[in-house]
A protein has these predicted regions:
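Ser/Thr/Pro/Gly-rich low-complexity disordered regions
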Residues: 1-269
Length: 269
């Protein structure tokens, strides 16, 4: 057996024996913890989950020949079961989708086989570059993405620590920051003189994408400049009923904003 073992380990025994009569020799096994038999552990292998940290594990082998004759027992040298490092079994990022400016949070599952208190160290990466390694006392489970951009790839890694030291580091699947939709910042005014309605839609895009303006619903004859958002409509002489207008702004990356309003006829004179 190794010089030091943890409760994650499984140990096994091999033996060589001679019989004066040339009979085949088998062995009876008994595993021991601090020289006391471990209940039910009488095979050639032992999962150390069956014992506790700090116990010294050994095994006693008793040779038996094919005629049932029993030889003297042999005991292995005892080996101490040392601290079993904590483990992290799953790491993820929430929410399920996010955009630049959102706050991300690491999710994880972890445990310590010895029942020790565990601290977790979180480290974040953006496009393969570390965003800094916090100390053991700084559990930076969240990440603010202000200043990040669409398409940034985010990863978080988690290292568990107990009093005996760190466990194995585990990282999440890459997490992609998504596109942000444009925002319309203007409001239309009523018809202008001589029955002419003009309105320039203004919009901004957080990702600085070029924007395309479109009329989804509009009265006959109304136009919009796709690159500037300027809306023009010469009201017909018979304009007497309300007209619905719906404008869409598209950033070319599946981000859209919409504005709806109603144009009403001017008061009769």
């Amino acid at each position: 057996m190794a010089n030091a073992l943890t409760r994650n380990d499984t140990v096994s025994l091999e033996f060589k024996a001679d019989d004066p009569d040339g009979d085949r020799v088998t062995a009876r096994y008994q595993w021991l913890a601090n020289d006391n038999p471990v209940d039910g552990q009488t095979s050639a292998t032992l999962s150390l989950a069956a014992v506790r940290r700090g116990e010294r594990v050994s095994a006693e082998l008793t040779p038996v020949d094919g005629r049932g004759a029993v030889g003297p027992a042999f005991r292995t040298e005892a080996v101490e079961v040392v601290n079993t490092p904590p483990v992290v079994t799953r790491v993820g990022i929430e929410p399920a989708t996010a955009k630049p400016g959102d706050v991300l949070r690491a999710t994880f599952e972890g445990s310590d086989m010895d029942g020790d208190p565990v601290k977790y160290l979180f480290e974040w990466w953006r496009n393969g570059n570390s965003l800094g390694t916090p100390s053991k006392d700084q559990e930076q489970r969240t990440l603010a993405t202000d200043g990040f951009t669409r398409g940034d790839m985010i990863v978080v890694g988690v290292t568990p620590y107990d009093a005996g030291g760190p466990g194995r580091f585990l990282v999440s699947e890459p997490f992609l920051l998504l596109n942000r939709a444009p925002v319309i910042t203007s409001s239309p005014k009523g018809p202008m003189g001589q029955g002419l309605f003009e309105y320039t839609v203004t919009a901004s895009d957080p990702d600085n994408d070029p924007l395309t303006y479109k009329l989804d619903t509009a009265p006959s004859g109304m136009t919009i400049e796709s690159n500037t958002g300027k809306v023009s409509w010469q009201m017909p002489a018979g304009f007497s009923s309300p007209q619905q207008v719906r404008i869409s702004v598209d950033d070319g990356n599946q981000g859209q904003a919409f504005q709806e309003f109603t144009l009403t006829p001017p008061p009769a004179r």
